[in-house]
């Protein structure tokens, strides 16, 4: 009981200190792709928000943005094969995300495929899959910049969303 209370207090403190620092919960690198789980709160609070407060993340987003605008994005800076890219995550309403890709650099004559797997909340049910492909016709990979966006209509908006980035050579 003491450990649980201590964990909860530490989680709340971490959440307060990291209000504007939205983190990546899990980052795993494989041979040809990487996986990370987008979250809307520090990892210690992810479980509570995802499974007990399905609408809480939107309210917390407004608070963390100091009420300036509810659609101010949450920014994630990631690296794939030493190439940086930024993901902006917007909340429009429960169940609708918009992922904005900026400065997505990939090698020339290759393609980067973005796969979104969204947990429907049904343990026996399938994950929702959406695919966004980015192609590189430019010879100089330093000049490649993809301002892409993808909207997903999700069943349970605040559950885990896995993002796969796979780069394939033609």
Curated annotation (Swiss-Prot):
Q: Tell me which domain of life the UniProt entry assigns to the organism this sequence originates from.
A: Eukaryota
Renumbered to this chain, the signal peptide range is 1-21
Transmembrane spans: 36-56
Gene Ontology cellular component? Answer: membrane
Keywords assigned = Membrane, Signal, Transmembrane, Transmembrane helix
UniProt-annotated location(s): Membrane
Membrane-related topology note: Single-pass membrane protein
* Additional free-text comment from the UniProt record: Partially overlaps YER085C.
List the protein's name.
Answer: Putative uncharacterized membrane protein YER084W-A
The organism named in the record is Saccharomyces cerevisiae (strain ATCC 204508 / S288c) (Baker's yeast)
Q: What lineage does UniProt assign to this protein's organism?
A: Eukaryota, Fungi, Dikarya, Ascomycota, Saccharomycotina
